[in-house]
């Protein structure tokens, strides 16, 4: 809206005054009038605001102009006062562009003025400071400023050129160059200065020539008496010329006098002095020369005295004492004294080192500073000391190595030596070489003698005492050879006697055991009959005494074999837990009789299947545990097995067994005696507890043979702990369903009652049982199992003792063997195991081999009981030459209802086999006419010849019977084709178990043979039989060649068997093993 335009009412309407004066119009137009007035008032108010804004804007513009004018005035005043540092401030927002332009122009002017002033000031300052050549820079200035700058630069340039020219000439004059003059253009006073300087240079050149001529003649050429001739000189130059000439004259007189004195001094005449009249410094020179002459006299006297003392009289340590000398003379004096001091130190150091060398001390060297020939002498002496030290070191080393340490063949390595030292070194090396040859020759002969070769003698050359020693050694060898021959004859006689002793013991054993076996057998049979109490007691005493005597005989035979070094150990596969468990089961009855707890614990982490001698391990455990039971009245006997902490080879394991008891203990002073032969802790113990004292001695020797050691800790009255270690190897044996021990039980049932194992663990165990050819039935509680027909279990596996107790309350499974399997089996109480019928145990998780090792003993004990039915009658052939043993065996067998035919030697047994068919043969090893081994070989050959395709059909089990306990009889009997082994005295239960097992196993194999014959079994049997050639061959090999290992019999009734499959043939193998492999193939 335009503020000058006034609001008006519509032309058709009345005016405001009309409306206000007319009430009627007022009432009609009141509202519109009010609106019109409001619009008018608002318009006026807007006009007022606009005017006020314009007024304020004008005031601000005036104020800004005044401020800018003030700032410009301040800058102008500063310029007038010579201050060019200030500028007009330019604000961020400038209201007037013209003012802004003025400010920029003024500031630019200030910059140019400041630059001009700085440049001109710089040039003026440089010229004032003597720095010529400077110029003022002109950066775009014009007008008067540019002209002023150019004039200043011209002035500076001219002044620079003139001053530099003058400076060059004066500098040349100062340096003695009088050939240059000033030739630069100059005007005014500068020109006058130029001419004056050039004139001065000419005069100086003439003066210098004349003065130089005089100086050269007098001072250089030594031509005295010359004068300087200079013309046209005045003032100072003339005076200077006169003074020079006077100086030359005086100098001539004085110098000639001084020359006379110095010439006399040079000729060694120190009596003359300078006498010319002198002044000033020449006088000082005169006095100095005269003083020099005096000092030279003193110096010559002192040096002469020192030289005579050091050089002639050999008195070291002297010094030249010259007073009041300075400069070169003082230096000469000091040098002379230094020479005397150095010479003294050097000679004394050389004397010290040579004295030390003379006294044998080669560690010192000349370390004093020296030069020239003295240095060469020093180096020569030090080199001599080094050579002597090397010589002494090498010679001492040879002497010490050869003479003290006994190191032969050493030579002194000394280089760079000549003369006597080289000769001595050569002599020492010759001595060492000769001594080496002689001693090594002596050593070779003594070494040969040590190795048993007494045919060689010392032939090396020697002299003196070495020759006497050589003779003595040769004589000693000769004497030793004779002694050895005598000792050899004596040893052979001793070995013959020892062999006779061993054979005597064997024969004695046989002769004693034969009637003793009869006594034991007959008393056992009598004890099984109706007897009175008195008769039973008497026969029991006889039976016990006979068994004790038999044990003593076995111990004596064992210690005899050990002493004769004929005792060896086997390396066969065996089950550790089964071996120890079986041994402790045989001792459990004795422990129960004495009301003792017999416990057993084996480290679950230790492997079960090992390679070693299980029979000897069992023997040691029986011995130690039996002793513990014997010497313990109350408490318990514990056997623990773990891995030893001692280090062995990587391929070996060290087994540690501890047998502890709460018995009588052993006194500390007796601990070292108990392992000696025929010794116990004291004699009273022998009388109270019985025994021969051989058990621990035999155990110690057996443990040593098995690579271990035995020790004991004991507290008297509280008990003992016997520890021993045995070195074994882990076994790689693999059980399958075709393994010999498992073949007879193929597809038999196994019940597993588990409350501790998870389902996953049970699945693994089920697969293992199936892999062994058995049928598992796994239940979580006894109620889920079918305990009646048609399922018939051979063994029952359990994982807790509580389950075993419940099973023994059930009549259906009361006599079935139990196998305990658990993650971590605590100590086993053998009383509980016997009462519950636990046959074996295993730790889980376990391998197939560990599982088979636990199952097989239970299966075999179950099969024996199943095959011991009295309704079964066997036809048995007994080959025995002793009448008592015949009657004993016949009574035992007939009592079981079996039919027995008796023959007296092996030949009769062979003929009987050819005539009749027998279920089993009991073959005595030693018989007249033909022994048991020879008879067995002939029987096996006849069986093979009778049916070369399938000799197994005609195979008759043969069980060896012997009272001979010497080493190798068992192995030999098995290797000859016998199926099992029974040691006398005959125990009815063990004998019947062995008979039943052999007959059962051979019947099972014959059945498998018949079932497999349709698959070309006979051809494969013939082809795979070792030694066979063709089906029609006369020597096609025997079934014995396919025989493996038969379990070794326990020597105590009730011990059971510990059968193991053997995967390699050796001298100890000889039973049914590979037949199963032939059937499988």
From Swiss-Prot:
Domain Histidine kinase per the UniProt entry, residue ranges: 507-730
Domain Response regulatory: 875-999
Protein localization: Cytoplasm
MF terms in GO: ATP binding; phosphorelay response regulator activity; phosphorelay sensor kinase activity; protein histidine kinase activity
Post-translational modification: The phosphorelay mechanism involves the sequential transfer of a phosphate group from His-510 (H1) in the histidine kinase domain (transmitter domain) to Asp-924 (D1) of the response regulatory domain (receiver domain). This transfer probably occurs between two NIK1 molecules, rather than intramolecularly.
Domain of life: Eukaryota
Main location: cytoplasm
Entry's EC annotation: 2.7.13.3
Family matches, as CDD domains: HAMP, HATPase_EvgS-ArcB-TorS-like, HisKA, REC_hyHK_CKI1_RcsC-like
Protein's GO biological process: cell wall organization; cellular hyperosmotic response; cellular response to farnesol; filamentous growth; filamentous growth of a population of unicellular organisms in response to biotic stimulus; filamentous growth of a population of unicellular organisms in response to starvation; osmosensory signaling via phosphorelay pathway; positive regulation of filamentous growth of a population of unicellular organisms in response to biotic stimulus
Reaction equation(s) it catalyzes: ATP + protein L-histidine = ADP + protein N-phospho-L-histidine
Any Gene Ontology CC annotation: membrane
Modification Phosphohistidine occurs at: 510
Annotated HAMP domain residues: 63-118, 157-209, 249-301, 341-393, 433-485
Region entry Disordered, spans: 1010-1081
Keyword list, A-Z: ATP-binding, Cell wall biogenesis/degradation, Cytoplasm, Kinase, Nucleotide-binding, Phosphoprotein, Repeat, Transferase, Two-component regulatory system, Virulence
Modified residues (4-aspartylphosphate): 924
Record's note on what induces expression: Expression is increased in opaque cells.
Chain's gene name: NIK1
Identification of the protein by name: Histidine protein kinase NIK1
Biased composition (Polar residues): 1023-1032, 1068-1081
């Amino acid at each position: 809206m335009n503020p000058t335009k006034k609001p008006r009412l519509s032309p058709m309407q009345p005016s405001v005054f009309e409306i206000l004066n007319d009430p009627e119009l007022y009432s009609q137009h009141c509202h519109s009038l009010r609106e019109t007035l409001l619009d008018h008032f608002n318009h006026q108010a807007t006009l007022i605001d606009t005017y006020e804004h314009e007024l304020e804007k004008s005031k601000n513009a005036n104020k800004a102009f005044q401020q800018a004018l003030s700032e410009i005035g301040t800058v102008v005043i500063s310029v007038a006062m010579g201050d060019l540092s200030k500028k007009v401030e330019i604000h961020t927002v400038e209201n007037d562009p013209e003012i802004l332009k003025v400010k920029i122009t003024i500031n630019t002017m200030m910059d140019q003025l400041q630059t001009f002033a700085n440049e001109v000031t710089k040039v003026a300052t440089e010229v004032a400071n003597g720095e010529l050549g400077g110029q003022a820079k002109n950066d775009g200035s014009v007008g008067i400023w540019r002209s002023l700058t150019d004039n200043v630069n011209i002035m500076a340039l001219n002044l620079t050129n003139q001053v530099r020219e003058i400076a060059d000439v004066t500098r040349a004059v100062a340096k003695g160059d009088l050939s240059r003059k000033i030739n630069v253009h100059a005007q005014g006073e500068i020109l006058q200065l130029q001419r004056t300087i050039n004139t001065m240079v000419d005069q100086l050149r003439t003066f210098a020539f004349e003065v130089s001529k005089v100086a050269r003649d007098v001072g250089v050429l030594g031509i005295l008496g010359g004068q300087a001739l200079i013309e046209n000189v005045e003032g100072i130059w003339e005076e200077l010329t006169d003074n020079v000439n006077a100086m030359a004259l005086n100098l001539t007189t004085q110098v000639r006098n001084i020359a006379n004195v110095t010439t006399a001094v040079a000729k060694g005449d120190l009596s003359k002095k300078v006498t010319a009249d002198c002044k000033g410094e020449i006088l000082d020179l005169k006095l100095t020369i005269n003083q020099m002459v005096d000092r030279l006299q003193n110096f010559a006297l002192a040096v002469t005295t020192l030289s005579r003392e050091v050089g002639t009289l050999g008195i070291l340590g002297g010094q030249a004492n010259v007073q009041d000398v300075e400069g070169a003379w003082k230096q000469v004096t000091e040098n002379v004294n230094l020479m005397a001091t150095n010479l003294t130190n050097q000679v004394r150091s050389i004397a010290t080192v040579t004295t030390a060398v003379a006294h044998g001390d080669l560690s010192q060297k000349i370390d004093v500073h020296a030069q020239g020939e003295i240095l060469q002498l020093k180096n020569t002496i030090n080199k001599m000391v080094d050579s002597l030290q090397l010589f002494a070191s090498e010679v001492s080393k040879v002497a010490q190595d050869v003479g003290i340490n006994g190191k032969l063949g050493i030579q002194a390595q000394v280089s760079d030596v000549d003369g006597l030292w080289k000769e001595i070194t050569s002599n020492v090396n010759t001595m060492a070489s000769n001594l080496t040859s002689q001693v090594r020759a002596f050593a070779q002969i003594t070494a040969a003698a040590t190795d048993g070769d007494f045919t060689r003698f010392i032939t090396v050359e020697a002299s003196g005492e070495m020759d006497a020693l050589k003779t003595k050694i040769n004589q000693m060898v000769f004497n030793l050879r004779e002694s050895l021959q005598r000792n050899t004859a004596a040893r052979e006689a001793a070995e013959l006697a020892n062999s006779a002793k061993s054979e005597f013991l064997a024969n004695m054993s046989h002769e004693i055991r034969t009637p003793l076996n009869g006594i034991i057998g007959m008393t056992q049979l009598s004890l099984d009959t109706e007897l009175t109490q008195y008769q039973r007691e008497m026969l029991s005493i006889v039976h016990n005494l006979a068994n004790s005597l038999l044990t003593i005989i076995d111990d004596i035979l064992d210690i005899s074999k050990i002493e004769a070094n004929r005792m060896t150990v086997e390396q066969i596969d065996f089950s550790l837990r089964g071996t120890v468990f079986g041994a402790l089961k045989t001792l459990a009855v004795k422990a129960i009789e004495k009301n003792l707890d017999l416990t057993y614990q084996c480290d679950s982490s230790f492997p079960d299947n090992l390679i070693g001698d299980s029979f000897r391990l069992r023997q040691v455990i029986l011995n130690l545990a039996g002793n513990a039971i014997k010497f313990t009245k109350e408490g318990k006997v514990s056997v623990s097995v773990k891995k030893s902490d001692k280090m062995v080879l990587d391929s070996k394991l060290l087994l540690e067994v501890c047998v502890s008891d709460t018995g009588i203990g052993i006194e500390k002073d007796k601990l070292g005696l108990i392992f000696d032969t025929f010794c116990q802790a004291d004699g009273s113990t022998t009388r109270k507890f019985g025994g021969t004292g051989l058990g621990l001695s035999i155990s110690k020797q057996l443990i040593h043979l098995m690579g271990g050691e035995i020790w004991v800790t004991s507290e008297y009255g509280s008990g003992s702990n016997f520890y021993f270690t045995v070195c074994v190897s882990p076994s790689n044996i693999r059980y399958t369903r075709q393994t010999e021990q498992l073949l007879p039980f193929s597809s038999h049932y196994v019940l597993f009652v588990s409350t501790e194992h998870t389902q996953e663990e049970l699945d693994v165990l089920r697969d293992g049982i199936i892999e062994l050819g058995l049928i598992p039935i796994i239940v979580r509680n006894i109620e889920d199992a079918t305990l009646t027909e048609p399922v018939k279990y051979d063994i029952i596996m359990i994982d807790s003792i509580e389950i075993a107790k419940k099973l023994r309350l059930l009549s259906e499974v009361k006599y079935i063997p139990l196998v305990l399997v658990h993650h971590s089996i605590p100590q086993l109480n053998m009383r509980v195991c016997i009462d519950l019928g636990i046959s074996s145990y295993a730790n889980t998780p376990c391998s197939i081999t560990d599982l088979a090792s636990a199952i097989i003993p239970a299966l075999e004990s179950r099969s024996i009981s199943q095959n011991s039915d009295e309704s079964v009658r066997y036809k048995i052939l007994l080959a025995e030459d002793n009448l008592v043993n015949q009657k004993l065996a016949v009574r035992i067998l007939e009592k079981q209802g079996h039919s027995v035919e008796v023959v007296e030697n092996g030949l009769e047994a062979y003929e009987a086999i050819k005539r009749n068919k027998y279920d089993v043969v009991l073959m005595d090893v030693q018989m007249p006419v033909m022994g048991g081994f020879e008879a067995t070989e002939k029987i096996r050959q006849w069986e093979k010849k009778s049916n070369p395709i399938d000799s197994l059909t005609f195979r008759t089990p043969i069980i060896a019977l012997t009272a001979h306990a010497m080493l190798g009889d068992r192995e030999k009997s098995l290797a000859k084709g016998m199926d099992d082994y029974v040691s006398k005295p005959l125990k009815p239960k063990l004998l019947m178990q062995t008979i039943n097992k052999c007959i059962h196993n051979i019947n099972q194999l014959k059945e498998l043979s018949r079932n497999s014959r349709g698959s070309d079994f006979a051809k494969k049997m013939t082809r795979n039989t070792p030694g066979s050639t063709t089906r029609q061959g006369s020597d096609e090999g025997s079934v014995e060649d396919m025989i493996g290992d038969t379990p070794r019999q326990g020597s105590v009734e009730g011990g059971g068997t510990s059968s193991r499959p053997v995967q390699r043939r050796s001298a100890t193998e000889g039973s049914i093993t590979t037949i199963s492999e032939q059937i499988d193939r």
